[in-house]
Amino acid sequence: MNVTMHSKKLLKPSIPTPNHLQKLNLSLLDQIQIPFYVGLIFHYETLSDNSDITLSKLESSLSETLTLYYHVAGRYNGTDCVIECNDQGIGYVETAFDVELHQFLLGEESNNLDLLVGLSGFLSETETPPLAAIQLNMFKCGGLVIGAQFNHIIGDMFTMSTFMNSWAKACRVGIKEVAHPTFGLAPLMPSAKVLNIPPPPSFEGVKFVSKRFVFHENALTRLRKEATEEDGDGDDDQKKKRPSRVDLVTAFLSKSLIEMDCAPKELTKSRPSLMVHMMNLRKRTKLALENDVSGNFFIVVNAESKITVAPKITDLTESLGSACGEIISEVAKVDDAEVVSSMVLNSVREFYYEWGKGEKNVFVYSSWCRFPLYEVDFGWGIPSLVDTTAFPFGLIVLMDEAPAGDGIAVRACLSEHDMIQFQQHHQLLSYVS
């Protein structure tokens, strides 16, 4: 397989950003993010238009979209905790693959990196790297794969998916039809000079491996049934609580990882465990904010399980449900931004503390289910597959398996040692494909 790079440049907004918009203050929630890049990969099997025309239209509409999301084309100033909206541009690459898309998808998992390979220079070899980068990959069959990377400082998955849908709409029907993003978080929750939170742990020297696993709908139905049977001695109230598919898969994966923690040491007892999820706070508080506000607006859910001997899936879903329910109930009453900021900081503080201490199994998850990633339509239909790439730390991402249905695709990023065990786990293999 050969990859030819046809274009590599910094793409700027089609219209210069006005002087009064050239600084965007970051919120406290932006400030506390780990500044890593999140990758998104969108597969489109066949394009109806000439590929040259398609690429030109994608480039011009992306440039127009940057006039609305002008901060994305700027640069991060960590000293002042602002984004300098100076129109320096985002990374932009066009490549051509000499194979058909279906052949590419049959290849190694590492092929996903090829879909973003042209972006590495932008993101790692400059003193002030772009906050986002896009790579367009054309295939022999007329298929297209769009790889995107966003610095987490500029926003969460809600913000990233909104940007991609805005670009797609600009390409499909014109920039005038695209809604302007809103930036209301920083005035309510300004950045702080001193953050009283521990740093996240360092994973320097650890080699992480990323693999994709799919729980089809029928597998989830079977898993739910077997989890209920496993809890045969549970009370009637517990049996009535039907966990969401995200909680179900999270609990099953956590159970598998707990068993992995015991196996090499031949232990009958595991360490206590902490299941960590990120909860979108939009529409959950009483704050005077737009429902589609851009930026980072989520809280960390720390669900602890103190069961150290053969935890059941229902034990773990109960821990998750309890932790999520408590946060939902608390934030629903809050109309004070300082209280929300304090709650978020406390959740991050607990997460980083336990993550770094190493006395518990800490399993970090992020659910992208129900975000409109499968709605990103540039004019030739929705993507046939949406995926992500590796992360610089242990993380398990849950995504919708396909445009329709309730299956879940899991992108697991684990240490090389843990991934070997994970792929051989007998129960996992019976549910995933």
Curated annotation (Swiss-Prot):
Q: Does the keyword Transcription apply?
A: no
Family affiliation: Belongs to the plant acyltransferase family.
- Name the gene: BEAT
- Source organism per UniProt: Clarkia breweri
Is Transferase included in the keywords of this UniProt record? yes
The UniProt keyword set, sorted, is: Acyltransferase, Transferase
Q: What does this protein do?
A: Involved in the biosynthesis of benzyl acetate, a major constituent of the floral scent. Can use benzylalcohol, cinnamylalcohol, 3-cis-hexene-1-ol or heptanol as substrates. Has some activity with 2-phenylethanol and 2-naphtalene-ethanol.
Kindly provide the name given to this protein in its UniProt entry.
Acetyl-CoA-benzylalcohol acetyltransferase
* Pfam families listed in its UniProt record: Transferase
Gene Ontology molecular-function annotations: acetyl-coenzyme A:acetyl alcohol acetyltransferase activity
Q: EC number(s) for this protein?
A: 2.3.1.224
Catalytic activity, per the record? benzyl alcohol + acetyl-CoA = benzyl acetate + CoA; (E)-cinnamyl alcohol + acetyl-CoA = (E)-cinnamyl acetate + CoA
Q: Which residues form the signal peptide?
A: none
Q: Which residues form the active site?
A: H152 (proton acceptor), D377 (proton acceptor)
Q: What class of enzyme is it?
A: transferase
InterPro entries per record: CAT-like_dom_sf
